């Protein structure tokens, strides 16, 4: 029996980083995205965010490429959200996304980080947070 795990911290942002996912209705978006991820045979460990972006910790199935999963999440949830009363100002997702490979040993720390998004963003903008993530990963901003 094969056993694999590819763990990714994925970040997607709204079009033009506009605050179009209200806190009061964000759980509807999270549930819809959770269903997409589950339907792709991937495991969602945590999802959370604020009005202009979402963080996900995902165990990627060996049957799907990371870029295909992100595309399916963005396309499916965008089409759905535009039809919902919960997101009257939602126009879609931005073109870019971040996906950072993670060690299973860091899973709990990343879940904690995702859980505390509202706290992080009292002190840091999305742009600052994203730049920090890119630099910590050894990539260029």
Predicted regions and their residues:
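Basic nucleic-acid-binding interfaces
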Residues: 1-141
């Amino acid at each position: 029996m094969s056993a694999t795990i590819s763990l990714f911290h994925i970040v997607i942002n709204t079009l033009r980083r506009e605050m179009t996912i209200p806190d009061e209705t964000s759980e509807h978006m999270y549930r819809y995205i959770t269903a997409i991820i589950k339907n792709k045979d991937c495991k969602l460990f945590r999802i959370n965010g604020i009005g202009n972006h979402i963080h996900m910790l995902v165990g990627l199935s060996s049957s799907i490429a990371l870029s295909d999963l992100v595309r399916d999440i963005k396309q499916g949830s965008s089409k759905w959200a535009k039809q919902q009363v919960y997101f009257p100002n939602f126009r879609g997702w931005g073109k870019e996304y971040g996906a950072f490979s993670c060690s299973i040993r860091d899973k709990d720390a990343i879940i904690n980080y995702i859980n505390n998004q509202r706290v992080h963003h009292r002190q840091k903008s999305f742009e600052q947070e994203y730049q920090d993530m890119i630099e910590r990963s050894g990539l260029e901003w």
